[in-house]
Amino acid sequence: MSTRHLVSICALIASTTLAAPVGAQGAPNVPKLQFEKITLPNGLEVILHEDHSTPIVVANTWYHVGSGDEKPGRTGFAHLFEHIMFMGSENVPTGQFDKLLEAAGADNNGSTTTDRTNYYEQLPSNALPLALWLDADRMGRLLPVMDQAKLDLQRDVVKNERRQRYDNVPYGRANETIVAALFPATHPYHWTTIGSMTDLSAASLEDVKEFFRTYYAPNNATLVIAGDFNRDSVVTWVNRYFGGIPRGPQMPARPVVPAFTVARDTFLVQEDKVTLPRLYKTWHSVKLFHPDDAALDVLADVLAGDKNSRLYKRLVFDMQVAQDVNAFQNSGMLDGYFQITVTPKPGQTPAKMAALVAEELEKIQRDGPTPRELARSLNTRRASFLDQLASVLGKADRLASYDYMAGTPDYAQQDLARYERVTAADVQRVANTYLKQHAVVLTVVPEGKRQLMVTGGAK
């Protein structure tokens, strides 16, 4: 809340509005997902959600391991296994995993974050037994056929991915530079999911196998089956294919995040093969589901969530000095950060962008957001929730995510309720609490243009 005296009726009304929750006028309107949760004797969590609207089913397996579980000197393993898991297993020859699914009309993929690795198949209902058998075989029978040739092949694939998505993409190395500067060397988010190519090159076959034995076990996984299926048949298949996989060792505790503060503003410059410079300002913030997490999301919406947001409207539309602007709260299970990025138009400088961003931050820190801005943010959040729950794959992903990260699959309504409870005072408070801290300020510049580096105005 502002500390200014309330010297008039208008000010009193304003302060009352500032304290009013965004969603005070209605309850969250997210549909409740019906599900059944079963835990096998080997520890595998199985979540079933029936949806018979279309003859489609999704099998979505989440392993509770991400790049944040790696150790310094052993980075990139979680993402490497995302690739290795498609190579084949004891009963599935090399190259046949995708071919079998393609023949069944399936769409399948995997992804890795700081906190988890997932694999999914979306396919016709009558092909579900195939997907479950394939997933079980790679969970329980991958190591016997894991050899040096497969490791070398997938290591090269990952290195090529790094070249394509990081090293040779405009601004592709920015995030790696930022997190390395923001988080201490012992912090599990100090590196990105792609990992260090030096670490991957040095990894032995036994190193990689040990990582699999530690984390790719049924007692460290959640399997969500969503869509058009018969419950009794699915339970039979799950027990048949997964029930015999031995329980793995006791899972290591999630890494302990070292307590730290960003002691000073850090100004960095990175030359890249880009036409326009780009400014990144990043503050240490909070982890997922922290009491301030939702308010920081709303703050990001107000600043640069859409074309009506403050920074976008002023810099892109009104002044026409920026190509684009973005803001977001990045919330991991262990920690988080808040970031604003601005790409100036030709002839404009990153330093000017930094000054304009600072002006807008001062305004919201002083006055907070308007009721209209809060309502717009909440409407966007509601629409996003409903959109994600409109598909079977979206439902499966939400159920797995909530089960692991919130402790229960039944969390969609509570999740949206966090945003319903955010007040203007909350947004103003988090803007002052986190965006007045020291920041990491990175300027990505065209090659030979280091003079464009921002060297002040981090707050």
What do these predicted ranges mean?
Residues 84-93:
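Catalytic Zn2+-binding segment of zinc metalloproteases
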Residues 114-120, 148-160:
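Short, glycine/charge-rich beta-strand/loop segments that flank catalytic centers
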